[in-house]
Amino acid sequence: MPAIAIVGAQWGDEGKGKATDLLGGRVDYVVKPNGGNNAGHTVVVNGEKFELKLLPAGILSPNAVPVIGNGVVVNLEALFEEIDGLESRGHSCEHLKISANAHLVAPYHQTMDKVTERFLGQRAIGTTGRGIGPTYMDKVARLGIRVQDIFDESILRQKIEGALRQKNELLVKLYNRRAVTVDEIAEYFLGYADRLRPMVVDSVNLLNDALDEGKVVLMEGGQATYLDVDHGTYPFVTSSNPTAGGAAVGAGIGPTRFSRTIGIVKAYTTRVGAGPFPTELFDEMGEQLRTTGGEFGVNTGRPRRTGWYDAVMAHYAARINGFTDYFLTKLDVLTGIEKIPVCVAYEVDGVRHDRMPMTQTEFHHAKPVYELFDGWTEDISGARAFTDLPLNAQHYVEALEKLSGCRISAIGVGPGRDQVVQVRDLIQD
């Protein structure tokens, strides 16, 4: 059975955890291929809310093996806090597997992240301050520390020493902070070695063997398309590639092994942090979407910026990722709105653009061109078939499907794991 990828189509917080949880009972492996504990997702099981960051949502599916892939950057302190939190609520994490090649977030990465943001002032990106960007920087600069390194103290110390030559120069001379010692960082990592060891695997062979055996492997992407370092709203992006191509790299699975690539997209749009946002709302309607949709960061509690659905972005995301299906989430949040605007094009300096502008400068100046759709007042939280939805809700979904260039195969109508309208099967056609 080929692999399946789940990818955010906007700026994150689209409901990827809900999609993973929906499919979790039917897959054998759930893989987190990228990111770190900088992005969270919420899953509701039997009315109980779980907020996950490093752990894949598949950790809550007893029949699926959760895997943290080689493309993830792992904060060990945060990882074990999350594990302990789940286990205290009766959910075992003994089946968790972690790639030996995943990179580790060191305490100095978090320090660098925070002081750099302060140093940038008004030009700050708006990171979570959890050290994700600096960890990826070290990975690319070949100064990183990987999971496998903490099981050999001599190698670990050599790598820490190499990294600190650069870090201490910056911390002391540029940021006026104290120097970090090899001993304190080594002690930090070694303190987790014994507990971590049973979880560590060769994830590439594990997952490819599973595919060879006909197992279903689900990639649960973090962040989203427009936070991708190559395809997102640069420089207001993350440090990895949370697109479908990045999922393949972050799990060590070849692109030809994917049968479905599912884009997760909200029925409206949200964003956290700085950066352009053409459909952003600054009025009472923006606050209504934020309040009704519970649009506050899982990690930071920061209120999310809110706006209308952007079909231009959705169409471009479908192209970048090669989406086979869209999973439309939070349609219920729009209930009660008389007229629902959808962005169908942009106007930049008086010129209409039906596609994404080529440059970020143009996108930053883009003004949305809206088409209005009639809303509905009926409660849709109990809908389970497409025909259960009010006609105006059906028309809205059909319009988004046409404008976004990708079929909508599932629709979220509430926070519960079962509050989904499945138009077609997401694993098998």
UniProtKB/Swiss-Prot annotation:
Catalytic activity, as annotated: IMP + L-aspartate + GTP = N(6)-(1,2-dicarboxyethyl)-AMP + GDP + phosphate + 2 H(+)
GO molecular function: adenylosuccinate synthase activity; GTP binding; magnesium ion binding
Keywords: Cytoplasm, GTP-binding, Ligase, Magnesium, Metal-binding, Nucleotide-binding, Purine biosynthesis
Positions bound to GTP: 12-18, 40-42, 304, 330-332, 412-414
SMART domains attached to this UniProt entry: Adenylsucc_synt (SM00788)
Residues engaged in binding Mg(2+): D13, G40
Domain of life, source organism: Bacteria
Name by which UniProt lists this protein: Adenylosuccinate synthetase
Organism: Micrococcus luteus (strain ATCC 4698 / DSM 20030 / JCM 1464 / CCM 169 / CCUG 5858 / IAM 1056 / NBRC 3333 / NCIMB 9278 / NCTC 2665 / VKM Ac-2230) (Micrococcus lysodeikticus)
Taxon lineage: Bacteria, Bacillati, Actinomycetota, Actinomycetes, Micrococcales
Originating gene: purA
